[in-house]
Amino acid sequence: MDSSYSFALGTSSSILPKLSFRNVENRFYGEKNNNNGLCKRFGSDLGSKKFRNQKFKHGVVYAVATSDNPKKAMTVKTSMFERRKVDPQNVAAIILGGGNGAKLFPLTMRAATPAVPVGGCYRLIDIPMSNCINSCINKIFVLTQFNSASLNRHLARTYFGNGINFGGGFVEVLAATQTPGEAGKKWFQGTADAVRKFLWVFEDAKNRNIENILILSGDHLYRMNYMDFVQSHVDSNADITLSCAPVSESRASNFGLVKIDRGGRVIHFSEKPTGVDLKSMQTDTTMLGLSHQEATDSPYIASMGVYCFKTEALLNLLTRQYPSSNDFGSEVIPAAIRDHDVQGYIFRDYWEDIGTIKTFYEANLALVEERPKFEFYDPETPFYTSPRFLPPTKAEKCRMVDSIISHGCFLRECSVQRSIIGERSRLDYGVELQDTLMLGADYYQTESEIASLLAEGKVPIGIGKDTKIRKCIIDKNAKIGKNVIIMNKGDVQEADRPEEGFYIRSGITVIVEKATIQDGTVI
């Protein structure tokens, strides 16, 4: 273009045209020379060999830049560079909700992982769904397979006709299917196989304008503007972009790990490595903008399981290059690195994979901290869930410390410390809850029904008188009698007691859905 800008360059700021990493506040830590014309022109005009940080937004530079060792102020004239802004209408999201949820068992005994409650009143599926809505992405596919009834019901109640505006978009549930002759052979075999089975949807006329496809997980807790992610993907002209986060050595083997060069390109991917393989994935994360101490604490880069593909690249990978590969993390991505441009996008905000009982429990209880790293309260980017039209919680002479109490609960002269109480929960006189996650109930029992059950020696939904519970997850519609003690005093780490209505995972007692714990039971 013929137009140009003039910039007054002071004596204390500078520019870094080396990296393509961006943070969540929509500003660049830097940009690659070979992909960003604005940085190329600045670098050429300044003639400097070493640069520091510079901020950019769409279309124009709003920070001031100088060389490292300026002798005087100067003016630089550079030609205008316009950055192509991605249209959300050309982006589709695929949310993976079909896993068997083995690591979250027994919470997934009757429900798909994305349908598991979180934060008192939400479901895990609400996280990627809300992030899509807040990012103006309104073409959303949800892939389901195991125990999908409650997930389908929640999606229908929450996102179909309940006031959430999708414009020309949609939310479409794609359930695992079989055709005659395929019985027992064609269930989803992995994340990539699940997407492959439904690539035909992008042949529909309404989806032919889709240029980029997001692949999202249904068991993570985070707040993310996906359009920042997609914009970075388009800016770098990558075939695939992986959203990544720095992690500590103690957590590293739980994730797919990547190595990224200084141009932002992923040069190595290893799925959940251990031992020597884990050590080989260690990297200097100061290049991501971490301080020396932060880099020491988090010397690995984990893939978040959030991917952005060029539509053409995704179709080619799954149907032509790797038609028998079933999983993105362990098969497709590592293979694609060899002959495709795979870029890394560094996400520096809170992110937690809550696909195990331990991480699920810890991530939930972290919400009650005085200054939590993540919270659902944000008027600009709210999290949506099903409208249940419940009355406010009623608490009679209760003591509550660092806790979250959902709508529609009845609490009578009880103590609740560092716990989350789900919707429609009932806590009777003398109950003591500590470090406990209670998922609530799907329906109420009236006072007369409760009285009748107690008179018959039965246990109503909720927690009975003088019961004491610590370090526990109580699934929906559980019935816990009076004078019960659930504390795992023996510090048992793993146990299966389905006939008694509970399991123990990582030292956390899990009372299963609809279980009945009789009066006086000690666990």
UniProtKB/Swiss-Prot annotation:
Keywords: Allosteric enzyme, ATP-binding, Chloroplast, Nucleotide-binding, Nucleotidyltransferase, Plastid, Starch biosynthesis, Transferase, Transit peptide. It is found in: Plastid, Chloroplast. The keyword Transferase applies. PROSITE patterns: ADP_GLC_PYROPHOSPH_1, ADP_GLC_PYROPHOSPH_2, ADP_GLC_PYROPHOSPH_3. Its EC number is 2.7.7.27. One of its GO terms (biological process) is glycogen biosynthetic process. The keyword DNA repair does not apply. Pathway: Glycan biosynthesis; starch biosynthesis. GO terms for cellular component: chloroplast; glucose-1-phosphate adenylyltransferase complex. InterPro entries: ADP-Glc_PPase (IPR011831), ADP_Glu_pyroP_CS (IPR005836), NTP_transferase_dom (IPR005835), Nucleotide-diphossugar_trans (IPR029044), Trimer_LpxA-like_sf (IPR011004). It catalyses: alpha-D-glucose 1-phosphate + ATP + H(+) = ADP-alpha-D-glucose + diphosphate. Activated by 3'phosphoglycerate, inhibited by orthophosphate. Allosteric regulation. Belongs to the bacterial/plant glucose-1-phosphate adenylyltransferase family. Heterotetramer. This protein plays a role in synthesis of starch. It catalyzes the synthesis of the activated glycosyl donor, ADP-glucose from Glc-1-P and ATP. This is Probable glucose-1-phosphate adenylyltransferase large subunit, chloroplastic. It comes from Arabidopsis thaliana (Mouse-ear cress).
